[in-house]
Curated annotation (Swiss-Prot):
Pfam families named among the record's database cross-references: Asp_decarbox
Positions annotated as active site in the UniProt record: 25 (schiff-base intermediate with substrate), 58 (proton donor)
Organism: Maricaulis maris (strain MCS10) (Caulobacter maris)
Gene, per the UniProt record: panD
Alphabetical UniProt keywords: Autocatalytic cleavage, Cytoplasm, Decarboxylase, Lyase, Pantothenate biosynthesis, Pyruvate, Schiff base, Zymogen
Protein name: Aspartate 1-decarboxylase
């Protein structure tokens, strides 16, 4: 049996941009993508801590060191600049592998500075 498990998450990031007229996606600083193990164009869920909204989109790379978390396209109606969000990516795996799997969690402060090194959840 295959299970869908949390692969990684960027926890409590702060939205820095919201562009309703962009084609879609979430722009994330390349440093954070690498820290979490999220690839450009990978599907992610975005959970808005401020308003409870949840949506699925895909990650695109923002410039390294920019601390960017930009909500693009129609999803910009679901998150505003300053909102705190959680970005989650998932992976499918067999049950035996899932039992041994430790997702990566990157904790961020209100300025999108990493406050804890990536670790297993």
């Amino acid at each position: 049996m295959r299970l869908t498990m949390m692969k990684c998450k960027l926890h409590r990031a702060t939205v820095t941009q919201a562009d309703l007229h962009y084609e879609g996606s979430i722009s994330i600083d390349r440093d954070y993508l690498e820290a979490a193990g999220i690839l450009p164009h990978e599907q992610v869920d975005v959970l808005n801590i401020n308003n409870g909204e949840r949506f699925t989109t895909y990650a695109i790379e923002a410039p390294r060191g920019s601390r960017t978390f930009g909500i693009n396209g129609a999803a910009a109606r679901l998150a505003q600049v300053g909102d705190r969000i959680i970005v989650v990516a998932y992976a499918e795996m067999e049950a035996a592998e899932a039992e041994q799997h430790d997702p990566v969690v990157v904790l961020l402060d209100e300025h999108n500075k990493v406050i804890a090194k990536p670790q297993a959840a």
